[in-house]
A protein has these predicted regions:
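Active-site rim/adjacent substrate-binding subdomains
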Residues: 2-117, 129, 133-136, 144
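Catalytic glutamate of the conserved HExxH
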Residues: 121, 125-129
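Auxiliary alpha/beta "docking" domains used to position bulky ligands
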Residues: 141
Length: 145
């Protein structure tokens, strides 16, 4: 083959500079995934803070009885809508923790996009604590832009 024929092929080494997203890049992806969720769902989540860490702390894992830090992709901490009250004392904001390393490992083993996995974890962590059914959560994921 001539060099001209080979020039139309993609560079087989073009993947070499690719890396897994850093914590900062992962947070950008998570923020964008949240922004693409249906407006009605985002309104229910007003004030929810999204945190990204590599893995859950030992304290979190111990409190949940989880043996491996790789088994937890996300966690909601706070008070879900069914339990909120106007007369309740001031509380910390609701938070969703996304754990980068377990999510990246899941991504490597499955044929889903990273954005779809992050969206799924976000919706399910928030959704369970807001009393949504699995069907409701799948519909929210489907409607994500």
């Amino acid at each position: 083959m001539s060099d001209d024929a080979n020039s139309s092929l993609p560079d087989p080494l073009s993947w070499r500079p690719l890396k897994a997203p850093s914590l900062a890049e992962f947070e950008v992806i998570a923020t964008e995934a949240f922004r693409r969720l249906p407006a009605e769902f985002r309104r229910k989540c007003e004030g929810v803070v999204i945190h990204v860490e590599d893995t859950a702390t030992d304290e979190v894992l111990d409190s949940m009885g989880i043996q491996s830090e790789l088994d937890l992709m996300g966690l909601f901490q706070g008070v879900g809508l069914p339990f909120q009250s106007e007369s309740a004392p001031v509380q910390m904001p609701n938070m969703v923790w996304l754990y980068r390393v377990p999510i990246l490992l899941y991504w490597a083993e499955h044929e889903e996009t990273l954005g779809a996995i992050i969206t799924h974890v976000l919706v399910h962590e928030i959704g369970h604590h807001f009393g949504l059914s699995d069907d409701d959560m799948y519909e929210i994921e489907r409607l994500a832009e």
